[in-house]
Amino acid sequence: VSPQTETLRARYAAAGLTQDAVARDPFAQFRQWLEQACAADLWEPNAMVLATAAWPESAGAAAADPDQLAAAAAPSQRSVLMKGFDARGFVFFTNHGSRKARQMARNAAVSALFPWYALHRQVLVEGVVERVDAVESRDYFHSRPRDAQLGAWASRQSEALASRRDLESRMARTTARFDGAEVPLPEFWGGYRIRPHRIEFWQGRTHRLHDRILYTRDAVAAGAGDGDARAGDGDVHAGDGDAGAGDGDAHAGDGDAGAGDGVGDARAGDDGFDAAGAWKISRLYP
């Protein structure tokens, strides 16, 4: 018997979220919530649902044909693991030949959702994605367990696979290929950074009167550089464990999201902008 979904209803009783109480910097606010998600022992608190969509080469023709538009430009989603963040954005890693990477190559606009259901919270990030530099990709790749490094070489992500046996055979050949040697960073694998212009924090409340606090990036202030809104000193990275989410292109860790220094308890100014003028804070109707 299927569940009666129309009657499934949760009770929300969490404390509120106000403009006066949140950090002026969304990355500092995110750090606080991530630490609380880790402390609550949520499963893979750094997992996020990444949404991407390509745009057809012939936009006019596709728009005239709904089926073609759906096939060429429909958004797709998958769970990936956020492996670090700082004032520049949120970093994840994947195969450059994967479906999401191909879509991002044609349309850099993405969104990511952190769904912390047990805490009645979610964080929605919208922005533009860019590749991280080779050094950052190499450093992270070599921090992964060796089996995960070999798996990145063995997987032709998003391509059709005849059987599980074929995948295991590729893994065996890859293991033999690098036996006794360091596993190099594949040229087809690396990191991406979401540079957000919009970050929304959602807190469930009673009577469906939920709290929604929105940070929006001011384009002029953002152009002045990345130093005007800091979440702390350095990146925050999840651990290097072996529990994969979604496509399996990134691996969760120990829940070891370390807090950086310098996160103050600053408040937004009367005009809604933070002191550097980079982020505007506003409240949305639920």
Where do the model's predicted regions map?
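Long, intrinsically disordered low-complexity tandem-repeat regions enriched in serine/threonine/proline
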Residues: V220-D270
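Binding-site signature for planar aromatic cofactors or substrates
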Residues: V1-V220, D228, D233, G269-P286
